[in-house]
Amino acid sequence: MSRAIHVFRTPDRFIAGTVGEPGDRSFYLQAVHETRVISVLLEKQQVQVLADRMGLLLEEVHRRFGTEVPPQGAQLDDVSPLVTPIDVEFRVGTMGLGWDADAESVVVELLAVSETEFDESVVLDDSEDGPDAVRVFLSPLQARDFSLRSERVIAAGRAPCPLCTEPLAPEGHICIRTNGYRRGQSFGLTQEQDEEE
């Protein structure tokens, strides 16, 4: 079977989004151009890394090339949900990020998880030997929007415990900082024994 490389040179949207309740969410990246939609599945940490690195790349591009980039506190333009139905093309394994100076674009490449070992030379390579890929070219504004939206999507999950910073679950939380006990409970005593003393 031949390799599929989905290229979006001028996407209408490139966004991160989720499906599911906090604590049980699936994370997706979606590239859209007119009626063409490609969705890929990935881990929350991958979204976080991509958003962080994209922000750092924009700062480096501005520093080295003088290219105008939107400020970090820019307002988010695209708050619409993912396009549905979500048909997953593949699960993301390797990710690549770069700057195309000629096009003044951030280049994002997402490679499918593969049973075959590949080195980083397959990133941005069009040869038939490699995993399926999605390659997206983003303007600095689109890249900043992606980064900002991704941060908001990640932050919309479960709130962190104020003591141990682990995510709080709706059914409760056993905090390692309190050795598994809840405040107000006496250790090793039933409520009746505690009231008698």
Model-identified regions with their sequence ranges:
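Positively charged, low-complexity terminal tracts
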Residues: 1-197
